[in-house]
Amino acid sequence: MNLPVSLACLLLSGCVFFLGVFVSSSLYARKKRAFLEKIQKLEHENQLLQTSLNLSRHQEQLIEDFSNRLALSSHKLIKDMKEEAQNYFGDTSKSFQSILSPIQTTLTTFKQSLETFETKHAEDRGRLKEQISQLLAVEKKLEHETHVLTDILKHPGSRGRWGEIQLERILELAGMLKYCDYDSQTTSAQGAFRADIIIRLPQDRCLIIDAKAPISDSYFSVEEIDKGDLVDKIKEHIKTLKSKSYWEKFHQSPEYVILFLPGESLFNDAIRLAPELMEIGASSNVILSSPLTLLALLKTIAYMWKQENLQKQIQEVSLLGKELHRRLQVVFTHFQKIGKNLNQTVQSYNDMTSSFQYRVLPTLRKFEGLETSSSHQIEEPTPIESLATSFPHTCDIDTNLAVIESLEKQD
């Protein structure tokens, strides 16, 4: 496909070049024909003059002069025509070169772009093939891990541990840190009950989360899925959590417990089979939660902590503002003292200058008129006219602090 395009461009360039040469040749032939006509006309006139010279010897010199001038004019005309033709063909050649040069450059650029595209396309095909191979390998690995996970979840102990791991992953996604934002496997003060996760809330409060994976062997059955026992296990666990009454053992907790189901499919299947589960759980102070709803709740708690920290920072800024205000009051007082001292110093300097000008300087001028003085003349001191700028008013610290405290009470 590239070769026909290149040949077409080259044929087009050749046609343009030969068309220009043909036009130039036509113009040159036309000028040559006009030149020959002029030569013939001049030769005819020359014949007439020769005939006239034969009739009159008196005009021989004139005819000779005219012939010489005619020869010179013809030579000059031929020379001018030759130079004009050379210049014209030279300009035409340059013009064609300027026309063909961009075309050649465009063809070269197009060829380079095409080669680059083919190289890149080959590289992309290689990378795509490699990625497809990796994807197939990952798919096989995922299929193997799915079978392994299915075998593991058939054991009750593994199912419980899987639920706890899923809960910890949700906590990590929410940006919470263990022992900082939450505690795991915390025992109550009486030591009788142990909560899976306790989330710390602002104002020394907490939220209790219990992870449950109510999965039976029939849940993984491929031939005939019977998920009726899923609802029974969830109802049984709701009764267990109600009997434990975590909110009474952990006094800073709200009067409910979050029952975390570690899978959107578990939550959806349970609600689809028994929509009354939400109402049953709420009446028992147990809130059912899927991974997504729990993540949204944890994000909300993180936002509450952010607002709590922001409020503490605002209070700290308020205290720092009060302290800064007191310290600035002291600084402003020192500034005022410095200004007063500067003004007193300037006033004393001006008084000394005035005394020197009117009492001491006249006597010194008399000394300068005598031979006993030196050749140097004592310069007259210049008084200072500007004074130190004072603050427009004194900062009333008690009034300003009272205003700040009143605004804080309103907030």
UniProtKB/Swiss-Prot annotation:
Keywords: Coiled coil, DNA recombination. GO terms for biological process: DNA recombination. The keyword Coiled coil applies. It comes from the Bacteria. Residues 26-64, 123-143 form a coiled coil. InterPro entries: DNA_recombination_RmuC. Involved in DNA recombination. Belongs to the RmuC family. This is DNA recombination protein RmuC homolog. The gene is rmuC.
